């Protein structure tokens, strides 16, 4: 999967604790599902070679966030779904917030689509970028009975923050090496704003 840019709720916040508990509880329903930190993947395939490059990515994220109106939340859940893809087996779908889209497009222009970046990044953000928070990574088929339990657990979790995560919770960017098994992924750098 390469190197990714994650946007995360800060540990200890309601959003982090609710999502982490939800991820762990769903993991118990389907054997072989790894545990991972709550996050929204902004972009993958970052072109970073060293710590200096990681710092530039995080500095760019920090600068972008400063342009967003205070109190505005980039993360707003719109739905949830079960999919066939391993990394999107169960997800909370997020609205395509204009600031989130701008952030994703800019990061892709600067650090992924190095050549002919603007046109490709514009196409990607409109046609391919599906903002979401993964709740499970797995290849297994989800049974109807498990789906009913998943539905109830997600519903219960969403009631805790009324489908509106606090803009104060989501404030950490991480550059993550996503090579090998999920348990071996490494955070190369992070910034909390």
From Swiss-Prot:
SUPFAM superfamilies: LigT-like. InterPro entries: Cyclic-nucl_3Pdiesterase, Cyclic_Pdiesterase. GO terms for molecular function: 2',3'-cyclic-nucleotide 3'-phosphodiesterase activity. Pfam families: CPDase. It is found in: Golgi apparatus. One of its GO terms (biological process) is cyclic nucleotide metabolic process. It is an enzyme of class 3 (hydrolase). Involved in the metabolism of ADP-ribose 1',2'-cyclic phosphate which is produced as a consequence of tRNA splicing. PANTHER family: 2',3'-CYCLIC-NUCLEOTIDE 3'-PHOSPHODIESTERASE. This is 2',3'-cyclic-nucleotide 3'-phosphodiesterase.
């Amino acid at each position: 999967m390469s190197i990714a840019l994650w946007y995360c709720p800060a540990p200890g916040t309601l959003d982090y604790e609710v999502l982490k508990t939800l991820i762990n509880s769903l993991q118990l329903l389907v054997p072989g599902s790894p545990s991972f930190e709550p996050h929204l993947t902004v972009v993958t395939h970052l072109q970073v070679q060293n710590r200096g490059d990681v710092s530039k990515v995080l500095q760019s994220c920090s600068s972008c966030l400063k342009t967003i109106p205070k109190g505005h939340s980039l993360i707003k859940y719109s739905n949830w779904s079960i999919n066939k893809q391993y990394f999107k087996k169960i997800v909370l779908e997020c609205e395509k917030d204009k600031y989130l889209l701008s952030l994703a497009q800019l990061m892709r222009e600067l650090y992924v689509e190095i050549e002919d970046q603007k046109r490709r990044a514009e196409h990607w953000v409109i046609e391919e970028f599906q903002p979401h928070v993964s709740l499970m990574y797995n290849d297994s088929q989800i049974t109807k009975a498990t789906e009913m339990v998943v539905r109830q657990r997600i519903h219960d979790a969403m009631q805790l923050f009324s489908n509106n995560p606090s803009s104060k919770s989501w404030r950490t960017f991480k550059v993550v090496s996503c090579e090998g098994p999920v348990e071996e992924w490494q955070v190369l750098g992070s910034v909390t704003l």
